[in-house]
């Protein structure tokens, strides 16, 4: 019996290392990173379709659903942290809400799958998968941002174990920065499940933004205007410079990726799209969210002037009220 128990314990330990493999340096196995990304992708996608599902007559590109999901989940984590820790209970409620949103918008999800299925099962999709594995490798091991060792990881742990603590900035000045990204990182840290924070959210954002850039650059030759293409190249260059720090849940990286995405999507809509006012308005709401990631990006909110003027000119008061409400909630 003792022999069987020891063998069973050995199997459990080996399985735990295979799926996680964490150590005191924050290193983890590539497989654990990829599995966490798949889960984060699915949850963000379900929540994002629930949020953008209010626009019943409009279909968005995949990245818009993911970004909407990230924003909505971050706002949820922030509000939940006012009352308790972002642990198993918070995650269970989030998952239940995501499943309900997915069920309600199942037809929209089916349309998205049919649109992108051909890309996934192609050489282009193979390249995307290889690139994701490459980023997963750097997310599994590398360097922490300096501020991560100072307060990022500690602030995430406070979210995980206590929630938002009133006046904590008096103990450590950096806690008072209160970046919303740390709330998002905490709810997908999975410490409540595996006993140690994974810190894979930066790599996730890095991957989806780079794939968004690659997908847009595939039609580079056919584009008459290359302003948006240069913005896509900017995303890739930023990743190239900071790829070895992909494992760090730093607020700087999330802020830059969202800022670059907003500028790229804005230029895409302006120069390659139909200058859709709805997309301009949603990107303005995303700019408000970016300011909550790091206040130094607050000037990005000035892009909201253009859609605001257009909406007021067309007397679309209902839409104005909706976007203003979203900005206040964020």
Spans of model-derived segments:
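Membrane-interface alpha helices of multi-pass inner-membrane proteins
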Residues: 76-81, 243, 278-295, 299-306
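Perimembrane helix-loop-helix junctions
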Residues: 106-109, 118, 300-328
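Active-site lumenal/periplasmic loops and adjacent helix-entry segments of GT-C-fold
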Residues: 134-228, 246-248
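Membrane-lumen/periplasm interface segments of specific transmembrane helices
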Residues: 140-143, 184, 321-330
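Membrane-interface transmembrane helices that cradle and orient dolichyl/undecaprenyl
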Residues: 221-222, 262-279
